[in-house]
Amino acid sequence: MPKSIYESIYKDLKQKIERDVFAYQELLPSENTLIQTYHCSRNTLRRAVSRLVSDGYVQTMQGKGVRNIYQPAAQTAFTIGEIESFRESALRNGHQSLTKVLLFTEFAINEKQALYTGFSVGTDIYYIQRLHYLDDMPLILNHNYFLKAAVPGLTPEIAENSIYDYLENTLHMTIVNSKRIMTVEKMTQIDEKYLKLNAEDYNCMAVVSSQTYNSDGVMFEYTQSRHRPDYFRFYDNAVRKSN
């Protein structure tokens, strides 16, 4: 089954749900109708619907159909089970995004950096500090470490636009999975400066540290994302397994 067909059906249905083409609690068109609409096999359609179920967008009901259960988040929300860029998350939630590069440099990983990034000592990387704005408000300060050998030609201009778009559509990299750790850490002076936080109101940050791998099993990125605590939200959809 071609992945591109399944992906295109999944993305189209997801966009229609997000844009209220199918209203909340409304049943989606029947399976046969969707098969005719997308000119696909039953298995291909069911795989796309299964992913929407995993995302928490729809719920299948035996003998009745597929019901839309999607409700948009009040604030921008990243999805725990998916890898998406800041721009993709903003677009999905209906917000305007902007990224500013504060620092773009190159160096080799030292022993201290190797402990928290996962890169080996001596590995050449691009180090980037980026400030992400949502609707003109600074929300996330990113510390990005990208493996130079895996992302040749990376520039500050690309970093201000979309690094993942460059990786996938120019370098044709397949991004497969990301290991994430979420912690609460003390706010630093850099956090306070760039995220416009008042130390009297906030003394902690929500921090997401991630190691991301491509289809060759190579870790090409370590990123520490430092989020404004008043706008931090990660979304997950949990399913109870039957005994």
Predicted regions and their residues:
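A generic "binding-loop/recognition-motif" signal
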Residues: 64, 86, 163
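C-terminal all-alpha effector/ligand-binding and dimerization domain
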Residues: 98-243
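Beta-hairpin "wing" of winged helix-turn-helix
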Residues: 22, 54-63, 69
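Extended, compositionally biased flexible segments
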Residues: 53, 60, 84-87, 91-95
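Short, hydrophobic-biased segments on the C-terminal half of alpha helices
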Residues: 49-50
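Residues in the helix-turn-helix
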Residues: 44
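Short, cationic-aromatic polyanion-contact patches
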Residues: 4-6, 30, 67-81
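Extreme N-terminal segment that seeds HTH/winged-HTH DNA-binding domains in transcriptional regulators
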Residues: 1-40
